[in-house]
Amino acid sequence: MIQWTTPTLRLTVRGADLTGTDVHATIKQGGRDPIEGEVTSVTYDAEAEATVVLADFTQVQTGGIRKGDATVQLNSVTAEGKRLATSEKRIEVGDNHIKEVLAYGS
C-alpha cells in the first residue's frame, strides 16, 4: 500500500466577507467525478481575506486523485446556499504529494 504524505494547499479568496459562511473545497481532475477536499481551517484578516488550508485530500489514499494536473476549487457558501466567492488553483499531483502550484485562478 502506498503511504501518502498529507498535502497542504493554501487558497486565498479576496473581495468578499466570508465570515459565517461554509467553505468547501472540490478537487477536479480530467473528466473524473469531483472529490470533496477537507477544509481544516479558515482565517480572516482585517480586509476580509480568507486563507483556507487543505490539510487532507481524503480520497488521495484510495486512488481518487491520480498523478498529473488537478484543479482545486474553493467555494464559500452562506447558510441560505448563496455562493459568495470562488477561487481556483491548478496543481500538479506527484507520486505522494502536491508537486507544485501551476497557476492561480481568479
Regions found by a protein language model. Name each.
Residues 1-106:
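Contiguous segments within soluble domain cores/interaction surfaces
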